[in-house]
Amino acid sequence: MANRMILNETAWFGRGAVGALTDEVKRRGYQKALIVTDKTLVQCGVVAKVTDKMDAAGLAWAIYDGVVPNPTITVVKEGLGVFQNSGADYLIAIGGGSPQDTCKAIGIISNNPEFADVRSLEGLSPTNKPSVPILAIPTTAGTAAEVTINYVITDEEKRRKFVCVDPHDIPQVAFIDADMMDGMPPALKAATGVDALTHAIEGYITRGAWALTDALHIKAIEIIAGALRGSVAGDKDAGEEMALGQYVAGMGFSNVGLGLVHGMAHPLGAFYNTPHGVANAILLPHVMRYNADFTGEKYRDIARVMGVKVEGMSLEEARNAAVEAVFALNRDVGIPPHLRDVGVRKEDIPALAQAALDDVCTGGNPREATLEDIVELYHTAW
C-alpha cells in the first residue's frame, strides 16, 4: 500500500525564526500580504513583531483582524471580502488554529471561487487549484495548523463544526518561533498543549497509521509529555520544546487522520464555543480507555515515553498506566476535569453524540463507535 506525506515546502524553527520571513517573501517575489489574525494579537503587540520587520524591509501589507475562536462561515466570508479588495497576492496567518484555519479557507476560495459556499468544502475538498500562497506563523503550541492539510469551520446556523481536508491548503512556509508564543497565559498553554498531545496520541492509534507517522507521533508524545508542565509554569526552554513537539505531531496526523476525541470535541465548539483544546483535553483519557483493547502494544509505548516504568507490566496494566498518565498531566496543568465544568448541558448529549458520530474524524478511530457508545462517553466525561 502506498502512503502519502504532504508537508510544508519550507519550515523555519527556533527563536527568531520569524526574522527569515522578509527574505522568504522577497525570494518568492510576493508583492503585498493580507495578514489574517485576531484583535487580541494586534492589541498585545504580537502582530507588530512581524509587521515591524515587514515595514523595515519595505514590504506592503494589509490586515484582517476579525477572526474569532472557532471561526465561522461569516468570518471566512468577511475575510475573503477584505482579501479581494486589498490588492494582496499572498496571505500571512498569525495566530493559533482559528486565524490559520480562516486563512486557509480564504486562500482556497480565492483561487477556487466555485466553492464560495464554504460548506461545499467539507470532507475531502475537491478543489482544482492550490490556495493563494500562505506563510504561517503560529502563536500557540497546539494546533499545528501551519503544517496540516486540514481546517475546521463552524456553521453557526446549523450549530456544527465541519472539517475540510485539502492538500491544496498547506502553507508554503511555516515559522515555528517560540518568541511568538511566549505571551500565552498558562491556561492557554495548557489547553493547546494537551490539544497537541491529543493529535499525537490519536494519530498514533488511528486506522491509517503507518511506520513513518508512528515514529513522528511517539516522538511528539515524548516531547510534549516532557515539556508541557514546564511550559505552563513559564520555562522558556520548555516552551520551545512544545513549539517543536506540536509541529512534529502535526507532520504525522495531517497525513493519517485522527479519531473519536476530535469527533466528540467538534460539537462542543459548535454548541457552546468551548475552546477546542479544552474539549480535547477533557475527553482524551476517557476515549483512550474506550479504545484501549483496539490499540495493540501502542499504549505501552505511550506510557513509557510519558515517564511510566512499564517493565514487568501486563498489557492491561500498561494500557491503564497510559490513561492515568494523561489524567495526571491534565490535573497538573489545570485542565477542568469534567465537561460540566465548561458549560456542557446533559440534555444536549444525544444531539452532541449524533454530531460526533457524523464527524469526519470519527471514522479514523481504531474502535468503531456506535451512537450509544458516544452517548455513554459523553456521560462519563460529564
Swiss-Prot record:
Any one GO molecular-function label of the UniProt entry: alcohol dehydrogenase (NAD+) activity
NCBIfam families: lactal_redase, PRK10624.1
UniProt KW Mitochondrion keyword: no
Gene Ontology cellular component list: cytosol
Annotated NAD(+) binding sites: 38, 70, 97-101, 139-143, 148-150, 161, 180-184, 276, 341
Catalytic activity: (R)-propane-1,2-diol + NAD(+) = (R)-lactaldehyde + NADH + H(+); (S)-propane-1,2-diol + NAD(+) = (S)-lactaldehyde + NADH + H(+)
UniProt similarity note: Belongs to the iron-containing alcohol dehydrogenase family.
InterPro entries per record: ADH_Fe/GldA, ADH_Fe_C, ADH_Fe_CS, Alcohol_dehydrogenase_Fe, Lactal_redase
Protein known as: Lactaldehyde reductase
Subunit text: Homodimer.
Entry keyword set: Carbohydrate metabolism, Fucose metabolism, Iron, Metal-binding, NAD, Nucleotide-binding, Oxidoreductase
Cofactor: Fe cation
Superkingdom field: Bacteria
BP-aspect Gene Ontology terms: glycol catabolic process; L-fucose catabolic process; propanediol metabolic process; rhamnose catabolic process
Enzyme Commission (EC) number: 1.1.1.77
Binding site for Fe cation: D195, H199, H262, H276
Effect the entry attributes to changing G16D: No effect on enzyme activity
Effect of G96E: Loss of NAD binding and enzyme activity
Pathway: Carbohydrate degradation; L-fucose degradation
